[in-house]
Each structure stands twice: as structure tokens, then as C-alpha cells.
């Protein structure tokens, strides 16, 4: 039956078109059962036929008879073989199966691999008189059971799942217009962006060597990207281009901390002795080669020579003696060394930012030239007042035709290639991306652009991480599965404030890149996310400026909403010195409880979980983790951290720590030495 002549009683999203048919005067009298509403069905009235019918806003199906839901789990039963058949129909047909149009029988585009039919997620309206409508956790029986585009390997059947995309969201937001300032992703642009970011990293490396004689501090470029995007007003999703101040506090602090030499963790006495000698020698050499005041030269040279003389005559000192002497030397020489290095380090920060702004401008010009209809400056849309369940961010600018991306499989890895550039993801996460795309994308029902968008997504995160071994993965670490399960079961958590399509546990989350990630369930950056109600998990990247901005946003949201709102926050328990974000949360009037998980007694999931080996999936945390419950009054009533719930959460951490698989060496051990 055609949908053109029908009208839905309860339109649920701004992007859905409405028919000319009139709606019933009393929508509640036509409401179907709750389980059908959750699956996207609404009961409508056909003015032409003068009788009711059922319409599914996810699949655009229309039925005269009451739909029958199949109990279908797309992970354990991807073909819907165990789904309950519709009554009085062929058991081989899914619920409401219809004839396929001739256009659907035709082959897909160059990036299509003919996935199973499935609904896309839509927005959901909230009203005071009706309970919240909830989107289906899994689609009903697919109307055209198909096969995977790849051959199943034995590992597929035994693979452990690190996510639960069946959890229904309880996050409520105000309806928003599609984002008009983000350009749709394109492989050509993503390839050029990758080349420019790699070039920028190389410039940073060369500047540190030429001006200060040091290697760039590990992960400092990645944290620079995070810190800059907190305040950046530019258009590029990755490269900062419009920041005030120009000098990055994060990059400046980290480079200065490694001057005159980087201080590493010491285990043995001889290492401590060598480190003390190197520091004294480097400080003296630096003060001699820079434009320092006579007083600074005198202080640094005297302390350096005194330390060297002490090292020559005292060979019985312990490791602690050497470390105490090093700390004393840093206190005496550090301010003078920092003073002579200040202008040079500021020059490094300024040069990198200027190059980034130039690369960003160049990328946008090229990107606009690829679009069929370049966007025009539009007036800001008026704020929407309608409350809806959270849905993925939408782009206002339509996507152009995308070039071909090749897909093949090597053992357990899916390999996607564009112009000779290959990105990889394991089979399990590739299937996860397919599910997320199916639930979230509304402009590509035949998956014609799926492979291109997956390539752009993987390339973006590969470039953000960097090319070093384990580089960047520590900034994308995730909580263990057992902890997520407990958070959902005990505290109603259904949304992650800091995640990505690759490491998310739930199907709804906030992430760094709305342009690439929105097609896979993301709501965009958390600092732009304004929920009215819901229970959220927040495990931010360990960047101090980002965490501080996060706390400000938490308090604003909790102060403005009278609906149940809860944030369970996981941050490093850094105490020497303590981070501003942790101090502010501990003093917040919204803090309801605080837990401390000791170092080496809990784990994180690797940020490289989509490509790493199974025995490298988890790593031990070398720092304690503070768990803070920030809730408004209504959130505290609904999701209070009671002793019983807290005991379950602690037990979940213990369960994850008793894992028998070998643990890789922590990739975040250097974070303790960041100060």
C-alpha cells in the first residue's frame, strides 16, 4: 500500500514529511500497544479508505492489519531465522513484508555491499499526556533476509562482543535543526587532511629539535588538538583555525616540562645518577647559549657545577639521595631555564597554530569545490522547544556522490582501500559499524555510501591517533564491559559523553567529529550537547583543559534542568598536583558520592580495540581512577548511588580485573609524568 495517501497520527521528527490526510482529533484513541510504538508503529487514519492503518516511521511500511513483532536479535540471529512469523502468513516472510520495488532489485552503488534491510533511527517526540516513546532496540524481522557480504570465519562465532547496541536511550534533548556548518565527509578531502596533519606533526617534531634540542613530548600533539577544539570556532573538524589565545597552554606546558631534558621514571640508582648529571649539564649548556640575565647565569652555573662536583666525590649516595638532589636542582634552576626558553617555546606553539589555520582554510576551499551545491550563509534557526529522545546529529548539506572504496578481508581484518591508502578494522567492529549505520543513517537506505563513510571514519581516527606505536590509544580508552553493564543495570546509564563509533558501548554517544560520526550514532561534541534528562557516563580524554571545560558544562546542565539528570564521571585521580577538574567536582554542590579505584587494580579497554589483538584489548591503569556522581535533585532521587548499587559497581571492577587474558603494558604510563 502506498504511503502517499496516508497520514501519521503522531509525527515524530522534523525530517519526516507529512501527508495531506487529516489527523484524528484524539490521537490517544488510535495509539497502538506500547511494544508497537517502541518499534516505530503508529495508528493512522486513511481519509480515502475511511479506515485505520498502521505506519512504521522507521521502515516507511504501511499495513491494514495489526503488525506482529518478531523476537529478533540481529547479533545472535542476523538472518531472522528464529523470529516469530506473522500470523496467517508465510513463515518465511518477515513482519509486514512487501514486494520489493524494481529500484530495490537493481544493484547498489560502487560502495554498496547489499546489507540487510533495516530501519534508521528517528527522533521521538515527548508529550506530557503520553509516556515517552522509545525507538526499538533492534529492528523487527528483516523483510529481505540476506547474507553477509563476507564469508564467516570460525572466529566470528566465538568473538566476544564489547558493546550492547540494544540498550534504549533515556537521553532527552530539545529538537534541533540539522547542522549547517559541517560539510559531509568525502574520501578525497579526508586523504588530503591526513597528509596535512602528518605534515603538521613533522613540523612540530622539527621545531622541537631545532629550537630546544628535545623530542616532542609524547602525546602532546594529540592533547594540543583536544585542547584547541575546546575553544576553536573554526570550520575544520580536526585542525584548529580560530582560537583565542593563539598560544596553547597545553602545548606550552608540556614542552616546557621537558626543558632542558625529559625526566623519566627511575628504577635504579645508576639511572638516577645519570639523570642528575644530564640535567645539570643540559641546564648549564642552555643558560650559556641563550640570552639570559647575569643573575640567571650565575645561579644556574653555580648550582650545576656544585651538583657535578658532588657527583664526582660522593659515590655512596642512594637512589633517594640522587632524586632529592635532582628535585633541589630543578627548584633552583627551573625558573631561570624557563625564563630563557619562554619566547622560543611560544614561537613553536604559534607557528604550529598558524600552519594549522592555513591548512584548515585550504581544506575547506577544496571541500566546497567538490560539493554540487555549495552552502550559503543561512540565518540561525530559532530555538526549538519540543522535547525528543536523543537522535544522531544530522547534516543540513546533502552528501555528493562519493568515489569507490574497495573492500576485502585478510583473516579477521576488514581492509578498505581508497587511492592506495588502506585502513583496517577487525570483523567484529566492522559489523558493529554496519549496525550503527543501519540504526542511525537516514540518507543512505541502500548503503551506497557506507564504505566511503567507513573509510573516512577510520582515516580520521587513524590521523588523530598518530603513527607511533600505541600512540593516541590511551586518549580513547574505554571502561570494561562489566562496568558498563553495571552502570546500565544499576544507574540507568544509556549514553556516553566521550566515545566514538569504534569504542562506544551504547548506540548513542557524543564524539569529537559530528561530520563522520553522526552517520554511526554520534550526537557530536559533548560541549555542544545539552540534554534535559537522562543518565550519562563520562570518561573524558585525559586532557586537563578539556576536563575543566567538561565540569563547567556539567554544572550548567545540572543547574538548568529540573528533570532527572545524572553524570557518572571517571577521571584520573591525579593528586601531585591535583587537576582543577577533580578539585572542582569534589567541591561541587551536585556531587552525591565519590569512589576511588586504586591504581593497578582495574583496567581500561584499549582505544585501539578495533585493530589490536584480543590479548591486547585491556591494559592496567597505572593511576587511580576517581568515580564521581554528579546529579541534580531529581536525578539523585531516580539514580541515587546507594550502598547496594555502589557495591555492584565495585564488584564489576573486580570482575574485570580477574580476567585471565594477558594484559599489555599500559600505554598511558607516561601520563603520570606530564607535569
Question: Residue spans of the language-model regions?
Answer:
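A periodicity- and composition-biased signal for non-globular, repetitive helical segments
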Residues: 57, 104-107, 465-466, 590, ...
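SAM-dependent nucleic-acid methyltransferase catalytic core
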Residues: 271, 285, 292-296, 302-535, ...
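Short amphipathic alpha-helical molecular recognition features
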Residues: 29-35, 42-47, 475, 539-542, ...
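Hydrophobic transmembrane signal anchors and adjacent membrane-proximal interface regions, especially
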Residues: 72-74, 98, 115, 126-134, ...
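Domain-level detector for long C-terminal conserved domains
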Residues: 119, 124-125, 131, 135-226, ...
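Charged, often flexible domain-edge or linker segments that flank or initiate folded functional domains
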Residues: 151-360, 366
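Generic recognition of well-structured, leucine-rich alpha-helical segments
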Residues: 4, 44, 48, 61, ...
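WW-domain-binding short linear motifs
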Residues: 1-52, 57-194, 204-205, 212
Amino acid at each position: 500500500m502506498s504511503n502517499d495517501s496516508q497520514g501519521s497520527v503522531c509525527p515524530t521528527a522534523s525530517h519526516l514529511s507529512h501527508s495531506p490526510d487529516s489527523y484524528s482529533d484524539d490521537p490517544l484513541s488510535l495509539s497502538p500497544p506500547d511494544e508497537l510504538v517502541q518499534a516505530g508503529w503508529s495508528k493512522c487514519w486513511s481519509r480515502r479508505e475511511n479506515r485505520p492503518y498502521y505506519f512504521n516511521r522507521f521502515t516507511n511500511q504501511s499495513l491494514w492489519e495489526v503488525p506482529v513483532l518478531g523476537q529478533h536479535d540481529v547479533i545472535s540471529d542476523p538472518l531472522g531465522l528464529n523470529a516469530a512469523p506473522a500470523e496467517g502468513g508465510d513463515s518465511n516472510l518477515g513482519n509486514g513484508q512487501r514486494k520489493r520495488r524494481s529500484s530495490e532489485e537493481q544493484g547498489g552503488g560502487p560502495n554498496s555491499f547489499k546489507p540487510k534491510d533495516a530501519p534508521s533511527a528517528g527522533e521521538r517526540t515527548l508529550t506530557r499526556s503520553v509516556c515517552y516513546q522509545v525507538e526499538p532496540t533492534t529492528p523487527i524481522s528483516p523483510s529481505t533476509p540476506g547474507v553477509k557480504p563476507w564469508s564467516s570465519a570460525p572466529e566470528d562465532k566465538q568473538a566476544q562482543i564489547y558493546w550492547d547496541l540494544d540498550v534504549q536511550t533515556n537521553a532527552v534533548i530539545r529538537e534541533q535543526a540539522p547542522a549547517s556548518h559541517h560539510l559531509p565527509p568525502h574520501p578525497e578531502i579526508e586523504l588530503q587532511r591526513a597528509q596535512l596533519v602528518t605534515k603538521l606533526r613533522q613540523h612540530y617534531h622539527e621545531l622541537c629539535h631545532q629550537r630546544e634540542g628535545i623530542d616532542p613530548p609524547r602525546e602532546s600533539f594529540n592533547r594540543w588538538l583536544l585542547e584547541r577544539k575546546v575553544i576553536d570556532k573554526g570550520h575544520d573538524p580536526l585542525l584548529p583555525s580560530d582560537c583565542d589565545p593563539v598560544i596553547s597552554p597545553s602545548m606550552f606546558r608540556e614542552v616546557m616540562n621537558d626543558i632542558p631534558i625529559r625526566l623519566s621514571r627511575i628504577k635504579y640508582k645508576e639511572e638516577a645518577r645519570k639523570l642528575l648529571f644530564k640535567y645539570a649539564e643540559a641546564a648549564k649548556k642552555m643558560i650559556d647559549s641563550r640570552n639570559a640575565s647575569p643573575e640567571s647565569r650565575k645561579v644556574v652555573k653555580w648550582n650545576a657545577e656544585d651538583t657535578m662536583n658532588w657527583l664526582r666525590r660522593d659515590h655512596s649516595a642512594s637512589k633517594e639521595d640522587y632524586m632529592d638532589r635532582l628535585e633541589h636542582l630543578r627548584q633552583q634552576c627551573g625558573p631561570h631555564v624557563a625564563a630563557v626558553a619562554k619566547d622560543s617555546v611560544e614561537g613553536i606553539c604559534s607557528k604550529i597554530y598558524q600552519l594549522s589555520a592555513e591548512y584548515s582554510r585550504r581544506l575547506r576551499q577544496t571541500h566546497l569545490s567538490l560539493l554540487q551545491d555549495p552552502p550559503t550563509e543561512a540565518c540561525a534557526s530559532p530555538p526549538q522547544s519540543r522535547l525528543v529522545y536523543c537522535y544522531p546529529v544530522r547534516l543540513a548539506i546533502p552528501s555528493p556522490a562519493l568515489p569507490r572504496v574497495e573492500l576485502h578481508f585478510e583473516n579477521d581484518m576488514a581492509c578498505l582501500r581508497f587511492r592506495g591508502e588502506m585502513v583496517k578494522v577487525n570483523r567484529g567492529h566492522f559489523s558493529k559499524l554496519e549496525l550503527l549505520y543501519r540504526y542511525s543513517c537516514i540518507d543512505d537506505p541502500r548503503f551506497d555510501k557506507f564504505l566511503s563513510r567507513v573509510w573516512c571514519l577510520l582515516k580520521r581516527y587513524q590521523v588523530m591517533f598518530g603513527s607511533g606505536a600505541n600512540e593516541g590509544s590511551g586518549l580513547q580508552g574505554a571502561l570494561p564491559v562489566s562496568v558498563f553493564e553495571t552502570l546500565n543495570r544499576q544507574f540507568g546509564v544509556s549514553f556516553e559523553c566521550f566515545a566514538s563509533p569504534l569504542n562506544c558501548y551504547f548506540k548513542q554517544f557524543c564524539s569529537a567529529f559530528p561530520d563522520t560520526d553522526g552517520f554511526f550514532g554520534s550526537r557530536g561534541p559533548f560541549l555542544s550537547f545539552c540534554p534535559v534528562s537522562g543518565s550519562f557516563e563520562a570518561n573524558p580524554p585525559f586532557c586537563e583543559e578539556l576536563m575543566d571545560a567538561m565540569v563547567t558544562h556539567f554544572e550548567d546542565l545540572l543547574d538548568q534542568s529540573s528533570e532527572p539528570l545524572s553524570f557518572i564521571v571517571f577521571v584520573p585521580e591525579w593528586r601531585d598536583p591535583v587537576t582543577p577538574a577533580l578539585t572542582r567536582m569534589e567541591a561541587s554542590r551536585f556531587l552525591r558520592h565519590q569512589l576511588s579505584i586504586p591504581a593497578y587494580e582495574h583496567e581500561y579497554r584499549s582505544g585501539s580495540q578495533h585493530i589490536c589483538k584480543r590479548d591486547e584489548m585491556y591494559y592496567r591503569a597505572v593511576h587511580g581512577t576517581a568515580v564521581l556522581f554528579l546529579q541534580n535533585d531529581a536525578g539523585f532521587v531516580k539514580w541515587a548511588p546507594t550502598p547496594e548499587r555502589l557495591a555492584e559497581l565495585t564488584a564489576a571492577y573486580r570482575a574485570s580485573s580477574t580476567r585471565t587474558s594477558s594484559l599489555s603494558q599500559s600505554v598511558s604510563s607516561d601520563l603520570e609524568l606530564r607535569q
